[in-house]
Curated annotation (Swiss-Prot):
The glycine cleavage system is composed of four proteins: P, T, L and H. Its EC number is 2.1.2.10. InterPro entries: GCS_T, GCS_T_bac, GCST_C, GCV_T_N, GcvT/YgfZ/DmdA, GcvT/YgfZ_C, TrmE/GcvT_dom1. The glycine cleavage system catalyzes the degradation of glycine. Keywords: Aminotransferase, Transferase. It comes from the Bacteria. It comes from Thermosynechococcus vestitus (strain NIES-2133 / IAM M-273 / BP-1). Belongs to the GcvT family. Pfam families: GCV_T, GCV_T_C. One of its GO terms (cellular component) is glycine cleavage complex. It catalyses: N(6)-[(R)-S(8)-aminomethyldihydrolipoyl]-L-lysyl-[protein] + (6S)-5,6,7,8-tetrahydrofolate = N(6)-[(R)-dihydrolipoyl]-L-lysyl-[protein] + (6R)-5,10-methylene-5,6,7,8-tetrahydrofolate + NH4(+). PANTHER family: AMINOMETHYLTRANSFERASE, AMINOMETHYLTRANSFERASE, MITOCHONDRIAL. The gene is gcvT. This is Aminomethyltransferase. The lineage of its organism: Bacteria, Bacillati, Cyanobacteriota, Cyanophyceae, Acaryochloridales.
């Protein structure tokens, strides 16, 4: 009989994570924490930490006219996207629901697409369905390691290992580099709210890079800290804060939509929803009493149930409990007093602006 651990997939860096506490994450066995979630969280906010995110999907869309084809499919305007630039967007179904949120990295004649681990096969099928047959969809997930190096000291840490100045690669830019003397690809993107890099290398180089960064004093971090960091930055987690029954208008992602585009997958449904009005809206909450809001906890206005929490934690940086959730639009304005049912108690809460945390712009150490 196969145990759960044996059935789960492992990244190529798994042998280097011994000593970590592991957790199932979708179909993967991933490090939850190495030391403590608090220590790992603070390392990223104050210095630098690294995450094994090799479980994420790594698709390459290749062929003549690939950018033009994508421009007709996603709601975001990609027309000005140049090689070396990246764009955050969403893939939608015909009803306007979010199939996945992705980052598209424009290259010469190809677009690299980093997708959520649990949706890799679904996203591959989405691209196969909507892209013309002349565009090849290649899944490089199994052969590549992806490491996120995040924090104010991330650039200073990575620079000595690369063959080019990193200061010239701005946020949401990417480039090929020689890393430890071997070809690699880096992007100035992340999921923590801090300056940082996502580094894509062949599996064998990935182990060497991880050990080199570890020897340089970089704190290894697990999914626990990754979750508290992204939540402070109010970055949504697919499958928890949004899914195929959630539209960008409901999730506060309407800034990704270019309504001037004549067509994209889901446009008609989104336009109808825009005209009719949404029935629920994503909000940020700060809890004013003791208790932590968790996924699925109900949100109240007086005795009326008005919504539900999707993510919540005790913010290490802010020292207070924060949450994301959906409420009826009439209860979504900043300053609105609500309550979250935490087990058998009602904890007062207030709607606050997102993100909960925004990094000081002067913290990056070049």
């Amino acid at each position: 009989m196969i145990s759960m651990a044996e059935a789960l997939q492992r990244t190529p860096l798994y042998p280097l994570h011994q000593g970590a506490r592991f957790t199932p994450f979708g179909d993967w066995e991933m490090p939850l924490q190495y030391s403590s979630i608090l220590q790992e969280h603070q390392a990223v906010r104050q210095q630098v930490g690294m995450f094994d995110i090799s479980h994420m999907g790594k698709l390459v869309l290749r062929g003549e006219g690939v950018l033009g084809a994508l421009q007709t499919l996603v709601p975001t305007n990609l027309s000005q996207l140049q090689p070396g630039q990246a764009k955050y967007t969403v893939l939608l179904n015909e009803a306007g629901g979010i199939v996945d949120d992705v980052i598209l990295y424009m290259g010469d004649g190809q677009v690299r697409c980093i997708v959520n681990a649990a949706t890799t096969a679904k996203d591959w099928a989405w691209f196969q369905k909507y892209l013309p047959a002349s565009i090849e969809v290649i899944d490089e997930s199994a052969s590549q390691v992806l490491i996120a190096l995040q924090g104010p000291a991330a650039t200073a840490t990575l620079s000595p290992l690369c063959d080019r100045p990193l200061g010239e690669i701005k946020t949401y830019r990417h480039a090929p580099v020689n890393l430890l003397g071997q070809p690699a690809w880096i992007a100035r993107t992340g999921y923590t709210g801090e300056d940082g890099w996502e580094i894509l290398v062949p599996a064998e180089l990935g182990q060497q890079l991880w050990q080199t960064l570890l020897a340089a004093g970089v704190t290894p971090c697990g999914l626990g800290a990754r979750d508290t960091l992204r939540l402070e930055a109010a970055m949504l987690l697919y499958g928890q804060d949004m899914d195929e029954q959630t539209t960008p208008l409901e999730a506060g992602l309407d800034g990704l939509i270019d309504w001037q585009k004549p067509d994209f997958v889901g446009r008609a449904a989104l336009l109808a929803q825009k005209q009719q009005g949404i029935e629920r809206q994503l909000v940020g909450l700060e809890l004013l009493g003791k208790g932590i809001a968790r996924h699925g906890y109900p949100i109240y206005a007086g005795a009326q149930a008005v919504g539900e929490v999707t993510s919540g934690t005790l913010s290490p940086t802010l020292g207070k409990a924060i949450a994301l959730g959906y409420v009826f639009p009439e209860f979504a304005h900043i300053g609105r007093e609500l309550a979250v049912q935490v087990r058998d108690r009602w904890v007062p809460a207030v709607v606050v602006p997102r993100p909960f945390y925004r990094r000081p712009r002067s913290t990056a150490k070049i």
